[in-house]
Amino acid sequence: MNVADLLASSRHCVVFTGAGISAESGVPTFRGPGGLWERYKPEELATPEAFARDPALVWRWYKWRQEVIYNARPSPGHYAIAELEAMGVVRGVITQNVDGLHQRAGSRLVVELHGSIWRARCVKCGSVYILDKPVEEVPPLCRKCGGLLRPDVVWFGEPLPQEAWRAAVELASVSDVLLVVGTSGVVYPAAYIPRIAKEAGARVVEINVEPSAITPIADVFIQGRAGEVLPRLVEEVKRRLRTRQALTP
């Protein structure tokens, strides 16, 4: 099965991404070797209980993460996905990442299943703030009511945002090709997305540096770095589309 042919023929390709694609931008992963969880215990930082216990500690960690991401650049994989969208091949991106690198690369329709590190939400009045740079004061406070702000991300033990989950399920359900990039496939309910697409009739194509929990249901598994594989795929898809246009009377 040729992946470039699949993409060139696709009417509704959707991309599903995990931490692996951002690791190529220098953003530490949670679960890979050298990932963030090797340096910190997740229960100390990424839970509602941890935030209630020590919001300043949690925010110092998120400020550090914001600084890493702020100084990072989207990877060639991010740019390739945005280019496929600009070509009309990709109709949407579902991501487990909270870094906003897809948007910085130019992707327009991005569903963020786990929230965004570039938003903060007041725990008292619910006001949401868009952040264009790392927070300065720790912990930040709501300008409207003085309440504590928290990162607008999904912590361990919290449900996914309903609106984002509905949008992701809808995209996956109508996809004819699901391109899975850089995810371990072990974080639920996000890991259901490839299965939802598969059951709806989509071809599942996985690009990963090593086999994952998704690999057994993938129609095609391409082993490699997203930043190397995806730009090559973009060029192959372009050639096929040009050939078709040339043959069209």
Curated annotation (Swiss-Prot):
PANTHER family: NAD-DEPENDENT PROTEIN DEACYLASE SIRTUIN-5, MITOCHONDRIAL-RELATED. The lineage of its organism: Archaea, Thermoproteota, Thermoprotei, Thermoproteales, Thermoproteaceae. This is NAD-dependent protein deacylase 2. Coiled coil: none annotated. One of its GO terms (molecular function) is NAD+ binding. Substrate binds at Y62, R65. InterPro entries: DHS-like_NAD/FAD-binding_dom, NAD-dep_sirtuin_deacylases, Sirtuin, Sirtuin_cat_small_dom_sf, Sirtuin_class_III, Ssirtuin_cat_dom. Its main location: cytoplasm. Its EC number is 2.3.1.286. It is found in: Cytoplasm. NAD-dependent lysine deacetylase and desuccinylase that specifically removes acetyl and succinyl groups on target proteins. Modulates the activities of several proteins which are inactive in their acylated form. Deacetylates the N-terminal lysine residue of Alba, the major archaeal chromatin protein and that, in turn, increases Alba's DNA binding affinity, thereby repressing transcription. Binds 1 zinc ion per subunit. It comes from Pyrobaculum aerophilum (strain ATCC 51768 / DSM 7523 / JCM 9630 / CIP 104966 / NBRC 100827 / IM2). It catalyses: N(6)-acetyl-L-lysyl-[protein] + NAD(+) + H2O = 2''-O-acetyl-ADP-D-ribose + nicotinamide + L-lysyl-[protein]; N(6)-succinyl-L-lysyl-[protein] + NAD(+) + H2O = 2''-O-succinyl-ADP-D-ribose + nicotinamide + L-lysyl-[protein]. Keywords: Cytoplasm, Metal-binding, NAD, Transcription, Transcription regulation, Transferase, Zinc. Zn(2+) binds at C122, C125, C142, C145. The keyword Cell cycle does not apply. The keyword Cytoplasm applies. It is an enzyme of class 2 (transferase).
